Amino acid sequence: MRCGYCMPREVFGSDFHFLPRAELLSFEEISRFVRVAARLGVSKVRLTGGEPLLRKDVPRLVHMLRAIDGVQDIALTTNGLLLAHHAAALGHAGLDRVTVSLDTLDEDLFRSIADTRAPLARVMDGIAAAHEAGLDPVKVNMVVRRGVNDGSVLEMAEHFRGRPEILRLIEFMDVGESNGWRLEEVVPAREMLASIAERWPLRPLSPQPDQGVASRWAYEDGAGEIGVI
């Protein structure tokens, strides 16, 4: 997989020199950093990437972080392709919850956006495995781009309505020169919400202290909630 947002093939090609493995932080170094941060009041930790599940033995790192005084919540963000294999071990190690990046339910579009030959079913299996492992709530992040996958918003909303997952719609953001950000591809949050509310009425939910940057909306018919970032 070569995610077009953070690792497009045209920028990170075969001649790109990645950081040598010997220079990566060890689990012990990561744990030491988190231990210091926890003493300063940090209580929530998120493992992300790149793809964190490409790192060998990530459940061991989760177990080490779980043992640190002051750490109350450990989350992980993943593309979901390896999640089915690791979910049970991650849950057993003490992971609290997981966020899966998924931008469409269309097989061909999924492979195009993710630049992968892996089937969409592997991501869906990973989401199911996360539930079985008790990694709830499972949040599904969808980055929406006009002319790319904005036509998938209603399909995604319909699929995840009434399910335990929380769909979060994300405006296409400029993260530097690598992701080819263009203003004309940005779909404003209000536009995404309006398209969904036209079919399924929504009501705003009161902010929670730990909800982060997302605004939360509930379906008026009780079929769950969505978030917008």
Predicted feature locations:
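Canonical Radical SAM [4Fe-4S] cluster-binding loop centered on the CxxxCxxC motif
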Residues: 1-25
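N-terminal [4Fe-4S]-dependent radical SAM core
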Residues: 2-4, 13, 39-40, 216, ...
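Short, small-residue-rich loop/turn micro-motifs
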Residues: 7-10, 102-104, 171
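A generic structural signal for secondary-structure junctions
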Residues: 8-11, 95, 114-118, 197, ...
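A short acidic, helix-capping loop that chelates divalent metal ions and anchors anionic groups
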Residues: 13-18, 106-114, 176-180
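Radical SAM/AdoMet-radical enzyme domain recognition
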Residues: 24-46, 55-166
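Conserved G/P- and acidic residue-centered "switch" motifs that form tight phosphate/ATP-binding loops
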Residues: 51
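Radical SAM enzyme [4Fe-4S]-AdoMet core and its adjacent flexible, acidic
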Residues: 108, 120-124, 128, 132-227
